[in-house]
From Swiss-Prot:
<comment type="similarity">
    <text>Belongs to the YejK family.</text>
</comment>
<dbReference type="GO" id="GO:0043590">
    <property type="term" value="C:bacterial nucleoid"/>
</dbReference>
<dbReference type="GO" id="GO:0003690">
    <property type="term" value="F:double-stranded DNA binding"/>
</dbReference>
<dbReference type="GO" id="GO:0005737">
    <property type="term" value="C:cytoplasm"/>
</dbReference>
<protein>
    <recommendedName>
        <fullName>Nucleoid-associated protein MS1911</fullName>
    </recommendedName>
</protein>
<keyword id="KW-0963">Cytoplasm</keyword>
<dbReference type="Pfam" id="PF04245">
    <property type="entry name" value="NA37"/>
</dbReference>
<dbReference type="InterPro" id="IPR007358">
    <property type="entry name" value="Nucleoid_associated_NdpA"/>
</dbReference>
<dbReference type="GO" id="GO:0003727">
    <property type="term" value="F:single-stranded RNA binding"/>
</dbReference>
<feature type="region of interest" description="Insert">
    <location>
        <begin position="21"/>
        <end position="40"/>
    </location>
</feature>
């Protein structure tokens, strides 16, 4: 699917080669990252918006597609967010996109300069439309070095933007922000890698706090499904069949890039005790949103048991319990009948070598 780019601009944040960070003038942020006020950064501002060319639209389409595939968190603006105040002036047409982008670039540079990991980057701001929804995309992209061969077959060094691998980006659903100011999901951001807090400064730049938690929502959904089956007095086999229906629906939504719609999900599974699942979930107050971003790792537990520890990793389909796999709680054992062929082959070869 294509996107429609309305406005786009690039600015640069440059860390001069001579910039030094004194080791004795650092302090710890709340997130445990080293911060400093002495990182020297320069902001190079483009003097006009980029023309909306085929190249600009392709550039933004690739960024959009890459962002869609990222693991994202959800956020909301803080009351005193300077970025949100500037954005509001833009949306109220009190300022234009270019001066808004200047404010944002300077604000980002000021926030980034506090950190020891500050590096150069290209700051991208783009307002675009996708599936009848207006978005503001914001990212800080790294440049990579490479080589190219010209028409004379001469080799030259070049720089290119790394638009497939980036960690510092956010997107604001302007349509949602306009029609539902109390939404807890109009802002999305890339969740940083485990153990890294580099992306946190970007949230500080935006003046945003985390909003909707997809992991918690998925866990609450699983609990609601389990309770629904229990209240319906289903057998273990019947419960597992319902859970598989839920998993198949959720898997389909993931593959389509869509969210879990609670009402739609409710229509795909049996009605128990004359009460649809959606009504049951609302009545029991699980705190579920009408639309839930699916988390694949959490949803797997609908159809699988898995665990690891002390050098052992086990994963099997839930429907095999009490059929081929038996659990003895008192003895703390699992008995497996019918080992996987490749595992059995490895064990037989080991036994043969020992003999």
């Amino acid at each position: 699917m294509s996107i429609t780019v309305n406005q786009i601009v690039l600015h640069q944040i440059i860390k001069p080669a001579s910039a030094n960070i004194p080791a004795n003038n650092n302090n710890e942020t709340e997130n445990g990252e080293t911060a400093t006020q002495n990182t020297q950064l320069e902001t190079v501002l483009r003097q006009e918006l980029l023309p909306i060319t085929a190249e600009a639209e392709q550039f933004m389409l690739e960024l959009h597609q890459a962002y869609q595939n990222k693991t994202k968190g959800y956020g909301v603006f803080q009351e005193q967010s300077r970025f949100a105040q500037s954005l509001n002036r833009l949306l109220e047409r009190e300022t234009d996109f270019l001066p808004f982008s200047y404010e944002a670039a300077k604000l980002l540079s000021s926030e980034l300069a506090k950190y020891a990991f500050a590096e150069s980057g290209t700051f991208v701001l783009c307002r675009y439309n996708f599936l009848a929804t207006d978005y503001l995309f914001i990212a800080l992209l790294d440049s990579k070095a490479s080589v190219l061969v010209d028409e004379k077959l001469e080799i030259h060094r070049t720089q290119y933007l790394n638009i497939n691998q980036f960690d510092i980006a956010a997107r604001i659903n302007l349509t949602d922000l306009r029609v539902n100011a109390n939404s807890n999901r109009y802002l999305t951001f890339i969740k940083g890698r485990v153990g890294r807090k580099i992306g946190d400064f970007f949230m500080d730049f935006l003046g945003a706090d985390e909003g909707l938690n997809p992991q918690v929502q998925n866990q609450c959904l699983l609990q609601a499904v389990s309770d629904y089956c229990q209240k319906g007095e289903l057998s273990a086999e019947q419960s597992q069949a319902v859970k598989k229906q839920v998993f198949d629906y959720c898997k389909g939504q993931i593959n389509a890039g869509d969210e879990i719609e609670l009402t739609e999900l409710s229509e795909t599974i049996p009605t128990l005790n004359q009460q649809p699942f959606a009504d049951f979930a609302a009545e029991q107050d699980y705190g579920l949103e009408n639309n839930i971003p699916p988390v694949r790792s959490a949803l797997k537990s609908l159809t699988k048991f898995s665990g690891s520890g002390k050098g052992v990793t086990i994963s099997f389909d839930a429907e095999l319990l009490d059929k081929r796999i038996y659990w003895d709680d008192m003895q703390d054992t699992l008995t497996i009948h019918g080992l996987p062929a490749n595992l059995k082959d490895q064990l037989q070869r080991l036994l043969k070598n020992h003999n």
